[in-house]
Design a protein with these regions (language model features):
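Charge-dense, helix-prone N-terminal extensions
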Residues: 1-153
Length: 153
């Protein structure tokens, strides 16, 4: 079984529409911020798969070299309380400005506005996380959007 990300234009449009539906459902006040964060991540990882999960009260978009979300390097979590930028292997990242939150392997930054993403320290953390990825990303192409099954309600 191949876990490579690829999809046609129609599949991509349908998956993007489902992603937007989930964002509107779980983080309606944050739709523009989620869009800005997705664009910011897609600029850094144009060939990454956006692996989208729905949980009880939030959504997650993992940016992965494959259709396996657990291989994701960076991610977005959104809910009614806001948007977070996740660093899956954030524990070992150099963070001189102490931006990363959390105590486990994965760490996160609250994305309060698009200006958060414009901070050089945030860009540096993301770029370092990508550089440390153990799963290589495709050199060319465009990553697919992969919708994973809904969680049990």
């Amino acid at each position: 079984m191949s876990w490579h990300c690829s999809s046609g234009a129609a599949e991509r449009r349908a998956a993007d529409a489902e992603t937007r539906r989930l964002v509107a459902k779980f983080a309606p006040a944050q739709e523009q911020l989620v869009d800005a964060t997705r664009r910011w991540l897609r600029k850094r990882l144009p060939t990454a798969c956006e692996v989208v999960y729905e949980y009880r009260s939030w959504f997650v978009i993992s940016y992965s070299a494959s259709a396996q979300g657990y291989e994701g390097v960076l991610g977005i979590r959104g809910d009614g309380d806001g948007v977070k930028l996740y660093f899956q292997q954030g524990k070992g990242l150099p963070d001189p400005e102490k931006l990363l939150r959390g105590a486990a392997q994965a760490r996160w930054i609250a994305v309060e506005s698009a200006s958060t993403l414009a901070r050089p320290a945030v860009a540096s953390l993301a770029d370092e996380a990508i550089a440390r990825s153990t799963v290589p990303f495709e050199a060319t192409g465009r990553g697919a959007i992969v919708i994973r099954s809904k969680s049990a309600k």
